[in-house]
Amino acid sequence: MASVLIREAKEGDCGNILRMIRELAEYEKLSDQVKISEEALRADGFGENPFFHCLVAEILPAPGEPQGSCMVGYGLYYFIYSTWTGRNIYLEDIYVKPEYRGQGIGSKIIKKVAEVALDKGCSQFRLAVLDWNKKAVDLYKTLGARDLTEAEGWHSFRFEGEAMRELAGK
């Protein structure tokens, strides 16, 4: 197989990233929840004060092969803050196209996010996974992550739409 490059996403990658976001949502059986547009990704990730950062995985052609590189995965992350431990990084999405899974590409993306976290002085690297995604759970544990639901009993909550407007009195 040709080599894999993990690099920072560029604004021009947003179309491919959005396609993979939709593929991930379909895999997670949550396609109806994707409301983001390519324009929003450009504005939110590549403006003056980006809300997120993104890494992409590309398969580079072997020397002499006629085709160009092929984007096969991504990891979208942002920085958060813990009142207990300070700077943290949160991996919102990690996705590798099905035909490229099992080749270590997801691990390479995760390791690169860990590098970024350490370079930025983060004390923790957080992520969430659906309970039925056993392969991902096993991968994260193999890489050294602790399952906080098992270890500490945390539940994750979300306010959205009408509940958020009602809460804010708007």
Curated annotation (Swiss-Prot):
The gene is SAT2. SUPFAM superfamilies: Acyl-CoA N-acyltransferases (Nat) (SSF55729). It comes from the Eukaryota. Keywords: Acetylation, Acyltransferase, Cytoplasm, Transferase. GO terms for cellular component: cytoplasm. Homodimer. The modification N6-acetyllysine is found at K29. The lineage of its organism: Eukaryota, Metazoa, Chordata, Craniata, Vertebrata. Belongs to the acetyltransferase family. GO terms for molecular function: N-acetyltransferase activity. This is Thialysine N-epsilon-acetyltransferase. Residues 4-166 form the N-acetyltransferase domain. Substrate binds at Y27, E28, E92, E152.
